[in-house]
């Protein structure tokens, strides 16, 4: 009977696959006939796939600490005090003054402060030169630092579109065009791009691990990728045309020129990448001691593969092996020891170790959709064991010991060697068991998060931005977008008021410490 039930499950799975293939073929035929295929309706798709979120399971097993008090009144700045007097005519004769009962009412004023600067003007006939009085620092063009700060904050913190920003400012008495708003957002007069570079460089030294994720973006109609790096102190965004290992390495090099080194580690990688022993032998003969430049690397590849169209994938793997080895040996940029990510191939082999996200792995179990009641029960029972083990790992992080690590490692082996008889589930369990080293890396490094939610939430910020602004048009606009997103999201993590911070930078006052300095300060405080 059990075998028959599993056969029913397999037939249902095959039937669903055939339905999907049949619909794809129908869509292809319709397109050839000049008609449209079946529309993709997001709500219907999600309903059919089911909820793959594990939020409720995780919430049940979180280690709850003491809740921080959120006294609202303590955080409110009082700008002025006004006494509200009692009408003495209504008071009885025995009424006695007992002080004041305070009530804080928050208010905001939106008003213009348009200034006409009368610049003194002198002319020297002998020098044939005109001398003008200097404008205040931070004043450039026809809009002051306050207006520019508000434009940048509304766009990148409030996620408002440029037409709506123009409408809002117009209602407030500021006459400004959408093209001027666009120039303010893209010209980056305050050099927030440099600020982003400083943030990333400081952040690389702040923790041994970094989280990474990516999402698609559009640049002038072309598909690009936003690579997102983060840890508890920062979030940085990098829009790039590709999402391969070399691209990730270039980001980690912080603008430093990529070089190639073929040492023992590089040759180990070449073997893992299934490069033939013949090619490896040739590389040993052609490699240069002390590293190779990009030009020298391309010359070596031309020697290995004289026919340009041949060995395209092998060329890429050879470049990756040499670039990774060179990155590990360089000392100019802080090395990332551990990358926490999903299971995407471009994040593998780059660092000394890789940690994987438990929640991402758990989604695969939530996507299983058995129809046989027995298999439904088997799946639910296993998922309970899965998330109970996740809860054990959370508890381990609060008080790690070698003994507890050994117990959890053995428990992982027991859970993920289970044979349930439900074929799809057993296949999924086997795949998880092969990721043991990456999933249990926190047993050696308890500071590691169990999930990659921080990077995924940052990717969601990028997607919410696209809801308002579908794409950037130019390289300058793309770089400005990345810089502002990095500054805004990093300021949130550091508890910095982004409006005040942007105002400080745009006005050129520089009274506030940079975000890069704050990252270093917080890191040093944690290590004391």
Regions found by a protein language model. Name each.
Residues 9, 121-123, 131-528:
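Catalytic center-proximal scaffold of phosphoryl-transfer enzymes
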């Amino acid at each position: 009977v059990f075998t028959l039930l599993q056969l029913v499950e397999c037939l249902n799975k095959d039937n669903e696959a055939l339905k999907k293939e049949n619909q794809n073929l129908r869509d292809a035929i319709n397109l050839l006939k000049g008609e449209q295929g079946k529309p993709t309706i997001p709500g219907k798709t999600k309903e059919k796939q089911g909820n793959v979120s594990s939020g409720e399971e995780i919430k049940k097993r979180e280690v709850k600490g003491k809740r921080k008090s959120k006294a609202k009144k303590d955080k409110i700045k009082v700008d002025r005090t006004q006494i509200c007097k009692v009408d003495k005519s209504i008071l009885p004769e025995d009424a006695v003054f007992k002080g004041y009962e305070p009530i804080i009412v928050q208010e905001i004023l939106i008003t213009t402060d348009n200034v006409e600067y009368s610049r003194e003007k002198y002319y020297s006939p002998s020098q044939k030169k005109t001398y003008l009085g200097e404008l205040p620092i931070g004043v450039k063009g026809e809009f002051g630092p306050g207006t520019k700060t508000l434009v940048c904050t509304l766009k990148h913190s409030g996620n408002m579109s440029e037409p709506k920003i123009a409408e809002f400012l117009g209602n407030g008495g500021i006459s400004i065009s959408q093209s001027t708003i666009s120039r303010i957002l893209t010209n980056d007069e305050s050099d927030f791009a440099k600020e982003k570079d400083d943030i990333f460089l400081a952040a690389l030294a702040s923790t041994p691990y970094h989280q990474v994720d990516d999402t698609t973006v559009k640049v002038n109609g072309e598909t690009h990728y936003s690579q997102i790096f983060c840890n508890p102190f920062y979030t940085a965004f990098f829009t790039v045309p590709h999402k391969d290992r070399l691209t990730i390495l270039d980001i980690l090099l912080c603008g430093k020129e990529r070089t190639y080194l073929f040492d023992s580690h590089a040759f180990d990688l070449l073997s893992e990448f299934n490069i033939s022993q013949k090619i490896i032998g040739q590389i040993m003969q052609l490699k240069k001691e002390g590293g190779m430049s990009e030009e020298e690397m391309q010359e070596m590849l031309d020697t290995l593969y004289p026919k340009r169209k041949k060995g395209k994938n092998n060329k890429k793997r050879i470049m990756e092996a040499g670039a990774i080895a060179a990155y590990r040996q360089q000392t100019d940029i802080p090395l990332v020891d551990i990358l926490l990510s999903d299971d995407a191939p471009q994040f593998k082999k780059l660092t000394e170790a890789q940690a994987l996200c438990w929640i991402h792995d758990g989604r695969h179990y939530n996507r299983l959709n058995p129809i046989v009641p027995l298999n439904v029960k088997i799946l639910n029972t296993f998922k309970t064991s899965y998330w109970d083990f996740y809860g054990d790992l959370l508890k381990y992080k609060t008080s790690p010991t070698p003994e507890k690590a050994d117990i959890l490692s053995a428990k992982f082996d027991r859970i993920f060697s289970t044979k349930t008889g439900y074929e799809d589930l057993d296949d999924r369990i086997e795949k998880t068991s092969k990721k043991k080293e990456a999933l249990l890396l926190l047993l050696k490094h308890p500071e590691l998060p169990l999930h990659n939610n921080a990077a995924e939430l940052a990717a969601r910020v990028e997607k919410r931005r696209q809801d308002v602004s579908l794409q950037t048009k130019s390289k300058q606009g793309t770089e400005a977008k990345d810089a502002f997103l990095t500054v805004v999201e990093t300021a949130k993590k550091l508890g910095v008021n982004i409006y005040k911070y942007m105002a400080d930078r745009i006005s050129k006052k520089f009274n506030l410490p940079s975000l890069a300095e704050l990252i270093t300060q917080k890191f040093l405080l944690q290590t004391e």
